[in-house]
């Protein structure tokens, strides 16, 4: 048996090929799985459970079917931090704290989306602190659907423009932040996404940091079992 980790699918109505690839994954890759963990940014944008698009509602039904066979866990990302209990319940997902510790086949492991580790990106960390406030989230939820969508579109546009000007280092995790989280959680393995740079990093003190990749051009899945870890790519099946 094995436990699977994915993240950064950025599903949207504009990229239904990714949704189709994810659906195939759910149909074919979970027979021997103990659990599925989704480490944030399942959706490209999420402005509230009350305006979920049809493709997202169909996906919720699919995830609900999966959850009847194995547990499905979700950690918020920076694109879908407004995903709430209503959609999670419809999808059969259990929402976890943004930093969660697990014992994976005898190895103490911490999992998270990963944006909190990019501490050199000061502007983003200020925004992240603001949107984590309960009051800010509540006020945002009180806005009209049109206004929320407009704000989300503006944030996405500004983020894309800003990221094009940021250095590779600023947009990656900061080593001191990684070390601090290992020390705080007393873990040996760390699993996260967000950076879109899939890799297995071997660190000091027998620690490992595993980064799951995005799903823009191909799928990325981390499989963890008692035998070890396997970070693999899943090519998309292009149909005509």
From Swiss-Prot:
GO terms for cellular component: cytoplasm; extrinsic component of plasma membrane. The keyword Chloroplast does not apply. GO terms for biological process: lipid A biosynthetic process. Its EC number is 3.6.1.54. Keywords: Cell inner membrane, Cell membrane, Hydrolase, Lipid A biosynthesis, Lipid biosynthesis, Lipid metabolism, Manganese, Membrane, Metal-binding. Binds 2 Mn(2+) ions per subunit in a binuclear metal center. The keyword Transmembrane helix does not apply. Hydrolyzes the pyrophosphate bond of UDP-2,3-diacylglucosamine to yield 2,3-diacylglucosamine 1-phosphate (lipid X) and UMP by catalyzing the attack of water at the alpha-P atom. Involved in the biosynthesis of lipid A, a phosphorylated glycolipid that anchors the lipopolysaccharide to the outer membrane of the cell. This is UDP-2,3-diacylglucosamine hydrolase.
